[in-house]
Amino acid sequence: MSLYMLVSTFAVAFIITVIGVPLFIPFLVKLKFGQSIRDEGPKMHEKKSGTPTMGAVVFITAMLISFLVFSFISGEVSAATWLLFIALALFGALGFLDDYIKVVQKRNLGLTSKQKFLGQVVISILFYLVYHFNDFAETLNIPFTNIEVDLGWFFVIFILFWLVGFSNAVNLTDGLDGLVSGLSVIAFSAFGVIAFYQEQMDVAIFCFAIVGGMLGFLLFNKNPAKIFMGDTGSLALGGSIAAISILVHQEWLLLLIGIIFVIETASVILQVFYFKATGGKRIFRMTPIHHHFELGGWSEWRVVLTFWGIGLVGAIISVCVVIF
């Protein structure tokens, strides 16, 4: 029965997305909701300008429908269900607002960094309050040990850092056709297996709803992309994967399962720090680091496949660590 629910959750999210995206693309084109390309970005990306964006509206809708329907059918509705709903829906809503400002008001940078950060903090605090008042463990496991560290009220700082950090990390990574879509299929599959192994069916249902939606979206988002997810999708996925790692109590494994997200973010931080420290010198040709490889002569598809491969290795190792 449990496996049937997971397969059904996956299938419904996949089917809704596969049907919905082709119907949504002409609607976005009619509204002229096209992606703007940064002037400072790689020149080979200029041809992507005008590609419909905000496609995440379809797959987030598909995921939420599938997740909530099968959660209620299976009787697996819990506090974790609503925590995951908060992460996906509210981070998605913040991203939607950012995208709307970019494509409708023609402000290429969208929300200011302060506005976006404030929104992320508010959502993270709401997540923490629901988490705290439902008596979830506010501890962190020391990797490869059975030692638990009780953080007490400092746990709220960790929640803020984790949710804000990973929502931004996935957002930074979303710069190549299919990159985040494929990495999300891999990462959420890994957490789905871990949640199933831990018998946390509510979390497992959520994971496989996302895998179904993302696999369906990948069919249209792979190179050459017919549609982009926008910040609507990247913020929602980043907030969700951070929330899942907390609920399955495998926070540190997210650094391995989401290793590409970590590397992309680290490359930006290092580049900025080195640039300021040396008065204008750079470590990489351009960051996030996927652009470094593009400017080094790699095709976009080669970068994406390589990064998927690294993400897959990290995910497999993580699942093995938990199960074996």
UniProtKB/Swiss-Prot annotation:
Query: Sorted alphabetically, which InterPro entries does this protein's record hold?
Result: Glycosyl_transferase_4 (IPR000715), PNAcMuramoyl-5peptid_Trfase (IPR003524), PNAcMuramoyl-5peptid_Trfase_CS (IPR018480)
Q: Please give the function described in this protein's UniProt entry.
A: Catalyzes the initial step of the lipid cycle reactions in the biosynthesis of the cell wall peptidoglycan: transfers peptidoglycan precursor phospho-MurNAc-pentapeptide from UDP-MurNAc-pentapeptide onto the lipid carrier undecaprenyl phosphate, yielding undecaprenyl-pyrophosphoryl-MurNAc-pentapeptide, known as lipid I.
Transmembrane segment boundaries: 9-29, 53-73, 77-97, 117-137, 147-167, 176-196, 201-221, 227-247, 253-273, 304-324
Superkingdom:
Bacteria
One GO process term, biological-process aspect = peptidoglycan biosynthetic process
Asked whether the keyword Nucleotide-binding is assigned, the reply is no
Offer an example of a GO molecular function term for this protein.
Answer: UDP-N-acetylmuramoyl-L-alanyl-D-glutamyl-meso-2,6-diaminopimelyl-D-alanyl-D-alanine:undecaprenyl-phosphate transferase activity
Q: Which reactions is this enzyme annotated as catalysing?
A: UDP-N-acetyl-alpha-D-muramoyl-L-alanyl-gamma-D-glutamyl-meso-2,6-diaminopimeloyl-D-alanyl-D-alanine + di-trans,octa-cis-undecaprenyl phosphate = di-trans,octa-cis-undecaprenyl diphospho-N-acetyl-alpha-D-muramoyl-L-alanyl-D-glutamyl-meso-2,6-diaminopimeloyl-D-alanyl-D-alanine + UMP
Keyword field contains Nucleotide-binding: no
Its chief place of residence is membrane
Looking at the UniProt record for this protein, which Gene Ontology cellular component terms does it annotate, in alphabetical order?
plasma membrane
Locations listed in the record: Cell membrane
Enzyme Commission code(s) on record: 2.7.8.13
* Protein's organism: Listeria monocytogenes serovar 1/2a (strain ATCC BAA-679 / EGD-e)
HAMAP family in UniProt = MraY (MF_00038)
Involved pathway(s): Cell wall biogenesis; peptidoglycan biosynthesis
Q: What is this protein called?
A: Phospho-N-acetylmuramoyl-pentapeptide-transferase
Q: How does it sit in the membrane?
A: Multi-pass membrane protein
Gene name, Swiss-Prot/TrEMBL:
mraY
The cofactor required is: Mg(2+)
Q: Which UniProt keywords apply?
A: Cell cycle, Cell division, Cell membrane, Cell shape, Cell wall biogenesis/degradation, Magnesium, Membrane, Metal-binding, Peptidoglycan synthesis, Transferase, Transmembrane, Transmembrane helix
Its family remark reads:
Belongs to the glycosyltransferase 4 family. MraY subfamily.
